[in-house]
Amino acid sequence: MSAYAIIAASGVGKRMKLQGSLSKQFLQIGGFPVIYHTLSAFERSASVDSVFIATRQESIELLENMRDEYGFTKIAAIIPGGKERQDSIYNCIELIERQILDSGTAPDAILVHDGARPFIQPDEIDEIAALSAQYGACVPATKPKDTIKFISENDPGYFGRTLDRSRLLQVQTPQGFASKTLIQAHKHARLEQTYATDDAALVEEFFPEQHIRIHETGYHNIKITTPEDIHLAEAILAKLQSQQELTSSKKN
């Protein structure tokens, strides 16, 4: 099968409280930038043919240098992002649509991933891509560990009712969709100036008949959002590397 991946890497990282123009995608984990780990996973994916990155204008050269230094051969384009995450995704979608029109062929699925999620694994990417092609849409998720409550509608200083945790999932990326579905969802959103926090919400809005397949991943697929996440990420990386070394030694 064939899949394209869009990497959203334009985030400033306000909650990281970074100084100057430093982007959270370039913070170091295990001696390498966050975005390096992300791109490495997609480079090793068997199903992803091309990767399109939307980033800040001042980060384009950094990513081009990283592509050349580490031999990320699947990167098809590194382009400026937009004002919001959704605008950045749309910029990549426009480029992909032009490529589809020029070539006459479309990928079976398009995956959209947060650049600040460095620990998605190649086999997970392949599974999500396959399910997206089979069912039209697939989103990774994991079970919440904490009890979740509504805020009171009458007084925001108090809780409302408690949600049934057994029926809740924390949504992650990469989110995968049939090419036409994702492209059209973003076009509708652009036309109607509708914004959502993720791509699945746009598909839910404009293609309600499209059921979205759940693929449970794990707690390793975190998004780097706050300073505390860097320490957690170092621990996750160490565990993943230990597991990989153990698997490799067993094969040998």
UniProtKB/Swiss-Prot annotation:
GO MF annotation list: 2-C-methyl-D-erythritol 4-phosphate cytidylyltransferase activity
Annotated site, Transition state stabilizer, chain positions: R15, K24
Enzyme class label: transferase
Keyword Zinc: no
Superkingdom as given in the UniProt entry: Bacteria
Site entry: Positions MEP for the nucleophilic attack: R165, K223
Record pathway: Isoprenoid biosynthesis; isopentenyl diphosphate biosynthesis via DXP pathway; isopentenyl diphosphate from 1-deoxy-D-xylulose 5-phosphate: step 2/6
Catalytic activity, EC: 2.7.7.60
Keywords carried by this UniProt record: Isoprene biosynthesis, Nucleotidyltransferase, Transferase
Swiss-Prot/TrEMBL catalytic activity: 2-C-methyl-D-erythritol 4-phosphate + CTP + H(+) = 4-CDP-2-C-methyl-D-erythritol + diphosphate
Keyword Nucleotidyltransferase: yes
CDD domains on file: CDP-ME_synthetase
GO BP of this protein: isopentenyl diphosphate biosynthetic process, methylerythritol 4-phosphate pathway
Name of one Pfam family that matches: IspD
Record-stated family: Belongs to the IspD/TarI cytidylyltransferase family. IspD subfamily.
Annotated function: Catalyzes the formation of 4-diphosphocytidyl-2-C-methyl-D-erythritol from CTP and 2-C-methyl-D-erythritol 4-phosphate (MEP).
Protein's recorded name: 2-C-methyl-D-erythritol 4-phosphate cytidylyltransferase
Source organism per UniProt: Chlorobium phaeobacteroides (strain BS1)
Classification lineage: Bacteria, Pseudomonadati, Chlorobiota, Chlorobiia, Chlorobiales
